[in-house]
């Protein structure tokens, strides 16, 4: 079925021509060899372009690790990132101009690229590249097939190699600053009421930072698709894992609507109460993502709901670089549920997001060289360069064979300038979590238990020691993977207006963006909640839930074929 998107497109041809003119060229020689790397026959480096529909930081053209990787693989990729548009708008611009980079990850805009015929089918290539072939099981590759039966993209994340090694909770949680926990002598925080009372009490006793800057007790990110920081907390408060668009009863395998639950009412009523008390940041509903990150980076924000990947590598590094960790400004997850029930937020095993991934476009003039580069990036030598860096410069190897970093190396790794000039993780290309081939080391520093703990700021170490844990994961607990349906967001993220359920999903998003801020700010909560519920029910959510249920049933049926 063809898909449709409603997209605002501006500066179409000009933008596309500016960004991606000359895609995939290597200084005049386009006859790249794909054997043992992608270097052209005359030794020149082949250059590709890539666009990722998420915000990111560009690295310097003379980046040191990128150059080392280029010398070893024969390829260098110029990466560009999303600025000033949604993913769908940016992709719509490219589609309208019919000009593309060599590589692309369009996020929620992937269906537009597929419909436009902009992507290269990968089926006939995968078997030629062993690292790519082994990246997924046969079942997982089959899950990536589109309605025409072909595979067009490779999901880049949550692929676990060997033994799982996880120290960070990369997903959604209630976060609170270490200074708040220390002030309260590291209390047990189990409920939503516990969480907000602690923030209230701390802010009443300590309304400013050391320099006199006022705290922001609690802020909410609501911009564009990131409004999950506001709207989907009820499913987590009820203890469910992150299916994103619904909850799933693991016994009956039925989808449930968290938007209308009793917990949803209690949660939004609590936010309303905290807003009236001045605890919720009044700029929450108008701030941009950049403004939100700037607030976190300043150390002023005591608590928030967010996903680790959405703030840690920006605000976390900024806090460390500014020395604000010495004031206890790092964020720690706490297992908050509505009534203290067990949470299922962190799950073992990888999560296959079949809804988007890295694709190669029709404008790539050497698909085999592009895929050889992806294959090379998954080799252990290059993967270590991407995530550990250069041995002796970015990390050391102990007598026991374990990788570790010195204090100076860790400090450098957090510096913005050093990351731009030296580090090159090719972060939106396929990658592994888990264990290296040596069976000892984690594929990334964040998974190396001793290195992870040694590299923690002192405020986090003190908190972990007080709670008797060594990782963020242990703060929350871990659970087995929920089931073959999981996660449902990999389906709902690509809903389109072609179906009744997809139209309902679009309308629900619009209603939430408009109504939920009003619910939080209203003087009369009950009246505002009724207005919101009336608008929500008018969106025909049953159609949306019905399509989710059909997809869940399909996933369970497909999984049964491989049992």
What are these regions (language model features)?
Residues 150, 155-228, 249-304, 358-400, ...:
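Helix-loop-helix "hinge/cap" segment bordering the ligand-binding cleft or interdomain interface
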